Structure formats: C-alpha cells, structure tokens
Curated annotation (Swiss-Prot):
A GO cellular component annotation in the UniProt record: cytoplasm
Top-level EC class: transferase
Compartments it resides in: Cytoplasm
PROSITE patterns cross-referenced by the UniProt entry: GHMP_KINASES_ATP
EC number assigned by the record: 2.7.1.39
Catalytic reaction list: L-homoserine + ATP = O-phospho-L-homoserine + ADP + H(+)
Taxonomic path: Bacteria, Pseudomonadati, Pseudomonadota, Gammaproteobacteria, Vibrionales
Official protein name in the record: Homoserine kinase
Gene name of the record: thrB
Segment forming the signal sequence: none
C-alpha cells in the first residue's frame, strides 16, 4: 500500500494580515505548483528518497531534511496514543523553490505529515495534525506560525485564530479573482526578512493595520470585492522588506496601471502576488513580470486561482 499527497503553494500574510492570513493557490493551467510526498511500506523504520526540479537544493543527509523531523514528531504522537508506527519509505518530490515566499517548507511539511497520517489510516484529527505542522514550520523559521501550513493543508483563505482549540478558519473570498504569482529566481531568507522589521511600531501604523485587516475580513464576509481589494495594504512588513526585493516597487506600479486590484509580497518574498479581476489583465501583468521581474531561468510566473482543496491524495504513484 502506498499513498501520494500533493500540497499546494501558499501566500503568507496576503499583505494585509501579517502572520495571521494565508491563501493557497494553484495555477489555472493545471501545473502542480507544490510538493508531493509518497509514503509506502518499507524494510526499516524510515528511509528517504528525493526527486523533483528543486531536489539539488535539499540537504544531502536525510536527517537534515524537515520531512525526517515530520516523521519523528508523527511517531511521538502515535506513541502517545499507544499506536505503532509502520516501517516506511518516503519520497519527497521537491517542486518548490526554497526561500521563495511561496510556502516551500510548508509544502514539504504538509505533504509529509498528511501522507504519514493517511498511510496510518488517519489516527490524528485535522487540528492535531495542523498543530504538528505549525511546530515543524517553527523549527525552520524560529517561531510557530500557521499562515502557510494552514492554507496549504486546509485550502482557501485562512485566518489564524488560535482560540477555543481552533487554530484557523476559512474566510470566504472571491472565486473570480486571478492571483498572478511571480518568483524572480532569487532567494530571500525568512529569518533575514524578519530581522529587517522594527521591534516597535508607531500608533498610527497600528491603527491603520487594524483598520485594513478588519476592513478586509468584513468586505470578504459581506461580498464586497472592490472594498476588500482596497484594504490589501501592509504597513507592518512591506515598507521595510521592499529593499530586499529589486524591482518590486516598479512591478507594483506597473500592475496598478495595467488594472490589477492589489499587489503585494508573498510571505517574506521575493515572490509577489498581483490580484486581477479578469484574465486579460492577469495575462498582461504576467507578461510584464516575466520580462521585467524574473531575473534568471529559475524564476517563473503563474496565473492562479485560490486553491480551495488544500493538500489532497493524488493516488499511490508519483
């Protein structure tokens, strides 16, 4: 028996919700923008194979790979429930660039833990599994946060709550929005992007941030796409992180002139997202970004929609 799980790319923060909002996205042309993990019966407790277009960026020692840590914490949780871990062989297909702002580590974590859970007939419930995913993400970025793993696992636009045992809940969004994702092909480390942020904020920035986030969530729930798009503004991170992203200011300016509703940094960058109301605008923005924002052959641009499914079982073979 084998199980393969695909976990999609995600946009952390979505500009307006620093560390509390995240959205899963999938290209409209059917390209798999995300990682896949296969788990099948093995002869030893754990063995790892790696594949995929970004396999060269992974550590050569399997024990340094985050999916090995996923296996360890999954084993810990099974032990607490008095359940036995099956000997298994895992294959990670790494299709996501590392340090891209597309939730690359979240893709590997979500695909690995979901596949492990499926392979063992789902002993952990959704929130237990999500808590483990946040723990693993924290191991990479230095603090537990869910704004990539929650949408990657659950799909859609997710708001982090962390109250009453609820880690996150889905916010209704606009299915007709196109999300143009542009990765320039350079790397920005999450730790560096966090270090650049101020330790304190001015009162007017805190008030503006609260107004934007509350306004955005209100507009999503009341079905006002124009208002929602206007509220996608970031006073917390983007003003400081722009300097890490060559060409971002020009890209945002062009996207607005071409008719995009909003443009922002995906996670800590360097990927940007641009929301467009119709496909013509999305294609125009995508073409410009391909010619002006992408810096090398590793970069790419995809026109996406919100991915409402999150991680899914795609079968038993890679």
């Amino acid at each position: 028996m084998a199980v393969v799980v695909y976990a999609p790319a995600s946009i952390g923060n979505v500009s307006v919700g620093f560390d509390v909002l995240g959205a899963a996205v999938s290209p409209i042309d059917g390209t798999l923008l995300g990682d896949r993990v296969m788990v099948k019966a093995g002869n030893e407790p754990f063995s790892l194979k790696t594949a995929g277009s970004f396999v060269a960026k992974l550590p050569s020692d399997p024990k340094e790979n985050i999916v090995y840590d996923c296996w360890r914490v999954f084993a810990r949780e099974l032990d607490k429930k008095g359940l036995e871990l099956k000997p298994l062989e895992m294959t990670l297909e790494k299709n996501m660039p590392i340090g891209s702002g597309l939730g690359s580590s979240a893709c590997s974590i979500v695909a690995a833990l979901d596949a492990l859970n499926q392979f063992h007939a789902n002993p952990l419930d959704e929130m237990e599994l999500l808590a483990l995913m946040g723990e693993m993400e924290g191991q990479i970025s230095g603090g537990v946060h869910y704004d990539n793993v929650a949408p990657c696992y659950l799909g859609g636009l997710q708001l982090m709550l962390e109250e009453l045992g609820i880690i996150s809940q889905e916010v209704p969004c606009f299915d007709d929005w196109y999300w143009v994702m542009a990765y320039p092909g350079i790397k920005v480390s999450t730790a560096e992007a966090r270090a650049i942020l101020p330790s304190q904020y001015r009162r007017q920035d805190v008030i503006a941030h609260g107004r934007h986030l509350a306004g955005f969530i209100h507009a999503c729930h009341s079905g006002q796409p124009e208002l929602a798009a206007k509220m996608i503004k970031d006073v917390i991170a983007e003003p400081y992180r722009e300097k890490l992203l060559p060409g971002f200011a020009d890209a945002r300016k062009y996207a607005a002139s071409a008719g995009a509703l909003a443009t922002g940094i995906s996670g800590s960058g360097p990927t940007l997202f641009s929301i467009c109301k119709d496909q013509d605008v999305a294609q125009r923005v995508a073409r410009w970004l391909e010619q002006n924002y992408v810096q090398n052959e590793e970069g790419f641009v995809h026109i996406c929609r919100l991915d409402k499914k999150g991680s899914i079982v795609t079968g038993s073979e890679l």
